[in-house]
Swiss-Prot record:
Residues 116-125 have a biased composition (Basic residues). It comes from Mycoplasma sp. PANTHER family: 40S RIBOSOMAL PROTEIN S14/30S RIBOSOMAL PROTEIN S11 (PTHR11759). Belongs to the universal ribosomal protein uS11 family. PROSITE patterns: RIBOSOMAL_S11 (PS00054). Located on the platform of the 30S subunit, it bridges several disparate RNA helices of the 16S rRNA. Forms part of the Shine-Dalgarno cleft in the 70S ribosome. This is Small ribosomal subunit protein uS11. The gene is rpsK.
Length: 125
């Protein structure tokens, strides 16, 4: 069987989706086709450790290593969500050696749409 050649992507988009429970970092080409991704859960964290900023930084570092195998040089960063790991993941991508074109926050905000889910209750011990 012939060895499949990896496609070379020099410009791309880094998508950071940060929720209260997990952080997902994915790299796509300019058309939106994802070629590298990682998340806090995918690198081995479970439960409440997935939502930590440290786990988000490790997930971003793992995604960056996968993206560098495709020859990525220039990145636009899109940040979505309100989770605790979004700034750590963004900083990890910025310090990884890519040329950063721009950083955008694309968190969807409702204009009084549907009713939001009820708040998470924290139990006192």
């Amino acid at each position: 069987m012939a060895k499949k050649n990896k496609k070379v992507v020099t410009q791309g988009i880094a998508h950071i989706h940060s929720t209260y429970q997990n952080t997902i970092v994915s790299f796509s080409d300019l058309k939106g086709n994802v070629f590298a991704w990682s998340s806090s859960g995918a690198i081995g964290y479970k439960g409440t450790k997935k939502k930590t900023p440290y786990a988000a930084g490790l997930a971003a570092a793992a995604a960056v290593e996968k993206a560098k195998e495709f020859g990525l040089k220039e990145v636009s960063i899109l940040v979505k969500g309100v989770g605790p790991g979004k700034s750590t993941a963004r900083k990890q991508i910025e310090t990884s050696g890519f040329t950063i074109k721009d950083v955008k926050d694309v968190t969807p905000t409702p204009h009084n749409g549907t009713r939001p889910p009820k708040k998470i209750l924290k139990r006192e011990k």
